[in-house]
Amino acid sequence: YEISACLVGSEMCIRDSGHNDIMQFIRPGYGASFGADGRKKAWWDALEDPGFNQMKYLKNLMLTFPFFERVPDQSVIAGTNGERYDRAIATRGNDYLLVYNYSGRPMQIDLSKISGAKKNAWWYSAKDGKLEYIGEFDSKVTSFQHDSGYLSGNDQVLIVVDSAKDYVQKAWTALPDAIQKWNK
């Protein structure tokens, strides 16, 4: 499954765009493009595949942080950004930033773009919603690369938050269901 990033207005989004059987509503016996023919799986059976459930991770990520102050901001990425699959996509609020990295390529992130002298950072898996605290950092340009390697399903979202804020707890291994969080 390919998870790709895009900007929608001032919103970063991650979407499942690689399951041909679902995208094309493949049915057995009907031809389709991109090599999908329905012999392996009909679109209704593909709804049970892992990629179909990934949108809940996007929902939890987006609703964890203040919505109306969020803006796209590629200046968060210091130095040279990659192209195509190596291009990182950034959005931020006043005290947090999110950087989607499809390929796992090393990136330089300017942590001074948000408030606070110290920042807490996590990796968030777009594939399974796992959250991994990676430490506290000074407010400066800092190198990040997830240890899962380069390409082949290693897309991650870097989450960085002003250490004075508590949007995300260091001990969390997943983001809570956002709807339940806001209904408390």
Language-model region placement:
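Positively charged, low-complexity/disordered segments
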Residues: Y1-G9
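Short strand-edge motifs at loop-to-beta-strand transitions and within beta-strands
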Residues: T142-F144
